[in-house]
């Protein structure tokens, strides 16, 4: 079976690097947002949602083509934007940085690669953080690589002016490890579905709060313009990367509002969401009944998850092209 990026065979844009996607910064997406030709009602809802989707953290591993190994070393050693942390004959580590933060991390370890039968070169970056100089370096490096594998890709939905502190985030089907962090007044700040080292982990967190507490000055300024800014993020590793456009179908995401249900139903749903130890003692048929109710019961006029799926469908071709570029599918075209 071919992987996701191997199914993409055409590229709409050309550059000096060969074939590349159009890089778009998250801030540009928000400020210069253009609506697709959709119906008035759906368009109004989309405008109210102010939602954007983008690729976030990316990790690729690869082999360096032998004929380009010296060229890559020269690039890393001589480019003024690159800081060399470590350099030996068979190993180096280097990075670009902006405001004291690593933007593009480059690691090469030939001996370790041979010892573990693994690709020896590794690149880590966040597409939303790349500056023009980083994009230029990235494009040059990708052209030097072969047998590229995307070992991590994050898909991020930014939800502007939507308070998700009382939203439900659950996985359909079999449960997974869950962790929550709440404020002093018991409002949700962060929720994790799945273990941090698993192939899939889903995060919902208060992005505005995170940016204001640990962002750069420009990031804090950007975040300050919003009353609410939340992010729903899907972190995928290894084989799960191929599920990047379908993993959203595995979750339940909606406001926590069951006031119109019977008291009995509300109690069962509350136990499922907030008292896992008690919930495990409930008969499996009852658990199945209320898990289905949680999934299908409409808790608000807007189906937020459906709107996010529609947005992903609209942006899928662009995101596929971007992923394929990182995987080196367009080099030399």
Segments (PLM) and residue ranges:
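Helix-turn-helix DNA-binding segment
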Residues: 287-292
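Structured, helix-rich domain cores that form ligand/interaction pockets
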Residues: 2-282, 297-333
């Amino acid at each position: 079976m071919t992987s996701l990026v191997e199914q993409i065979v055409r590229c709409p844009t050309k550059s000096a690097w060969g074939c590349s996607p159009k890089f778009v910064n998250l801030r540009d997406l928000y400020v210069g947002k253009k609506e697709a030709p959709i119906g008035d009602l759906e368009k109004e809802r989309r405008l109210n949602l102010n939602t954007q989707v983008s690729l976030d953290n990316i990790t690729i591993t690869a082999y360096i083509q032998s004929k380009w190994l010296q060229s890559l070393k020269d690039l890393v050693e001589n480019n003024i934007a690159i800081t060399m942390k470590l350099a030996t004959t068979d190993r180096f580590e280097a990075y670009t940085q902006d405001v004291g933060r690593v933007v593009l991390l480059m690691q090469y370890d030939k001996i370790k690669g041979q010892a573990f039968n693994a690709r020896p070169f590794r690149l880590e970056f966040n597409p939303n953080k790349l500056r023009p100089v980083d994009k230029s370096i990235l494009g040059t490096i990708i052209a030097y690589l072969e047998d590229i594998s995307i070992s991590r890709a994050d898909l991020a939905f930014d939800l502007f002016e939507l308070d998700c502190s009382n939203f439900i985030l659950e996985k359909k089907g079999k449960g997974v490890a869950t962790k929550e962090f709440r404020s002093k007044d018991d409002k949700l700040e962060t929720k994790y579905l799945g273990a941090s080292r698993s192939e899939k982990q889903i995060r919902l967190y208060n992005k505005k709060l995170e940016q204001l507490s640990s962002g750069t000055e420009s990031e804090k300024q950007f975040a300050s313009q919003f009353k609410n800014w939340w992010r729903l993020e899907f972190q995928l590793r290894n084989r799960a990367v191929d599920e990047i456009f379908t993993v959203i179908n595995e979750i339940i995401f909606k406001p926590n509002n069951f006031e119109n249900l019977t008291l009995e139903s509300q109690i069962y749903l509350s136990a499922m969401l907030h008292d896992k130890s008690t919930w495990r003692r409930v008969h499996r048929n009852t658990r199945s009944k209320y898990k289905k109710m949680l999934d299908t019961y409409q808790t608000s006029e807007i189906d937020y998850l459906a709107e996010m799926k529609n947005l992903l469908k609209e942006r899928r071709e662009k995101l596929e092209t971007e992923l394929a570029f990182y995987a080196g599918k367009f080099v030399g075209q």
